[in-house]
Amino acid sequence: MEGDAPVIAANPLEKNTDPMVALQKVIKESLAVQGVARGLHETVKALDKRTARLCVLASNCDEPNFVRLVKALATEHNIPLIEVPDNKALGEWAGLCKLDKDLAARKVVACSTLVIKTFGKESDDYKFLMEYISKQ
């Protein structure tokens, strides 16, 4: 088989370069250890008590007062803030959905904001996300 191109195997340990994918995995790991507070009320309580270690805000939140409040509390208490483009995607990442038999998300509830109070294990995605936040 002289004309065949060499087959290059994908590296399974390839580092992630997309912060949204890394954020999704970090949220999933935090959900496993009950370290996520979802919604405005829980987020504001965690930000006030300074138990939040990372705040995530949906940029398409329909209430501008929510956005101002969360941004102000996060900056006042020096808690890193990441904005995601879609509140439906954030709701799916936060587990606010039903899964069908094919494990596809159904009936996704929009989530305007969430905070991570406890990270799961310190994975490569966690390290990448913290490095990304420190560069901002």
UniProtKB/Swiss-Prot annotation:
Signal peptide: none annotated. Keywords: Ribonucleoprotein, Ribosomal protein. This is Small ribosomal subunit protein eS12. Gene3D superfamilies: 3.30.1330.30. Pfam families: Ribosomal_L7Ae (PF01248). One of its GO terms (cellular component) is cytosolic small ribosomal subunit. One of its GO terms (biological process) is maintenance of translational fidelity. Belongs to the eukaryotic ribosomal protein eS12 family. GO terms for molecular function: structural constituent of ribosome.
